[in-house]
A protein has these predicted regions:
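Active-site anion-handling motifs in enzyme catalytic cores
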Residues: 1-196
């Protein structure tokens, strides 16, 4: 086993995915300088050579982005036809869900195909906690029966200048809310924001 991690990333045509990969590599460099990082495209099926590299590593890490979708396997992560070919722990880092409506109620019955559920079961049983980028994703995963996950936020959110420093709370006089695109189609959200 080599002192390395393999990360599967989705940086193909989304600027946010490139940012996530870039920041994750910086975080690994800062926090695990003893580990080499090998980056493999998540959408490409793993061949014998890539599997050998992965199985010589400490872990396979599935990096961020809106990867949790019904057919995450094979659409986002092609992986291999047999998950048992991957001998090392598989861990998710800062992964998010993808929902057209983005409503909390959607997290209670978030659909996943059999291959995606099998991958999440393997991740859940890895012996390591995996991370998601928001509470909607965490709830969707938990309602699908997977509990070894925690909400850490997106790797891109982490400011390296403040890692390992004590939180300095200052008096807050103003709070800003970003409603995202859901605001456009949600009269109830608009009403709540105007009333409060």
């Amino acid at each position: 086993m080599k002192d390395q991690y393999v990360i599967l990333t989705g940086s193909k045509n989304n600027a946010g995915d490139y940012l996530i990969k870039y920041r994750a590599k910086q975080l690994f460099s800062d926090l695990r300088p003893d580990r080499k990082i090998i980056d493999i495209n998540g959408w490409e099926q793993l061949n014998t050579e890539k599997l050998a590299i992965i199985n010589q590593s400490k872990a396979l890490i599935l990096m961020g982005g809106p990867a949790l979708i019904k057919n995450m396997v094979p659409k986002v992560y092609a992986l291999t036809n047999n998950l048992e070919d991957i001998k090392v722990p598989i861990i998710m880092m800062g992964t998010g869900w993808k929902s057209q409506r983005g409503n909390w109620e959607d997290t209670y019955s978030y659909p996943l195909n059999v291959k995606t559920s099998s991958l999440l079961k393997k991740i859940d049983n890895s012996g390591y906690q995996s991370s998601v980028r928001d509470y909607h994703t965490l709830n969707a995963i938990r309602f699908n029966g997977f509990n070894n996950f925690l909400m850490t936020g997106c790797p891109a959110y982490y400011d390296r200048d403040f890692i390992k420093t004590e939180l300095q709370l200052k008096e807050v006089n103003k709070v800003a809310f970003s409603l995202g695109v859901a605001f456009i189609e949600s009269p109830s959200m608009e009403k709540l924001m105007k009333e409060n």
